[in-house]
Amino acid sequence: MVVGRDGKPRCAWAGSGDGGLSRYHDEVWGKRTHDQSAMFEALTLGVFEVGLSWSIVFGKRDAFAKAFRGFDPTRIATMTARDVDRLVQDASIIRNRAKIQATVDNARAMIAASPSLGALARSYEITRKQAPRSLTELPTTTKQAEAFAKQLKAQGYRFVGPTSVYAFMQNVGVVNDHVRGCFRATN
């Protein structure tokens, strides 16, 4: 737990409240959303986080938003092999061809899928009786995330293992993993 200059206690990973990561913690992470672009952003950042650290991916968040058309799945689904080739050369993002192509494929899956990503997310909601005491109490995955990942893969999503799906669930508020004492925790 850290207390920022604004006096708000936050999860330690968010920092002191002075930068983008703290704003993300305060305004986005763990906040329930049904917005398709916000959900796709969370899914995409999770795809790029596989094998890397969150700080690396988060540091490129604005560049990803630009590269992936504001995280609008309908617009991303129209991207071509030429667009993928162009993004592989874009030094402002993580230039992993497989992850870039997975993002395009995931947009297509999201548009075609039934039930929708939002409906699936709601069906795997996790309710806690109390907030975790510390980050060490947080799981990296759950049975719900394993089942959710399996269903997403069946719908054609890629790079969606149980760990990245659990991170997605945290990000979009399907589970509230703000730690006890954080002003965003549900105690």
What are these regions (language model features)?
Residues 1-187:
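HhH-family (HhH-GPD) DNA N-glycosylase catalytic core used in base-excision repair
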